Amino acid sequence: MNRTILVPIDISDSELTQRVISHVEAEAKIDDAEVHFLTVIPSLPYYASLGLAYSAELPAMDDLKAEAKSQLEEIIKKFKLPTDRVHVHVEEGSPKDRILELAKKIPAHMIIIASHRPDITTYLLGSNAAAVVRHAECSVLVVR
């Protein structure tokens, strides 16, 4: 049975993506793993918290998802992986929730996630990587 690896990608942070490439490639070679890439678009309440109204200021969610998928596909080209083993997912909502949901659904044997170095804000507020580590039902590799 092939392993399944979930790789959440923040399309707005290329430095984080660079950090996981070698780890994903190495893990994917084991048992010819299937690799699922995921990016998450914040939901509309997030945009409202930035002071944007629910109006023409906000692009349609379908447009946001299409653009995110296009960007994710460009990022995936940096990984040396067989294309028939790569899957692309774009979701809306809380990153940690969508990561955990997809990990259960596919089901993932491992999640490889990049994380910023911890600072006071991550200790006070928590981070997506920390939440994934705490709640995932599979192994999680956090790359810093």
From Swiss-Prot:
CDD domains: USP-like (cd00293)
Short name of one Pfam family: Usp
Cleaved signal peptide residues: none
InterPro entries: Rossmann-like_a/b/a_fold (IPR014729), Universal_stress_UspA (IPR006015), UspA (IPR006016)
Subunit structure comment from the entry: Homodimer.
Family statement: Belongs to the universal stress protein A family.
NCBIfam families listed in its UniProt record: PRK15005.1
UniProt-recorded name of the protein: Universal stress protein F
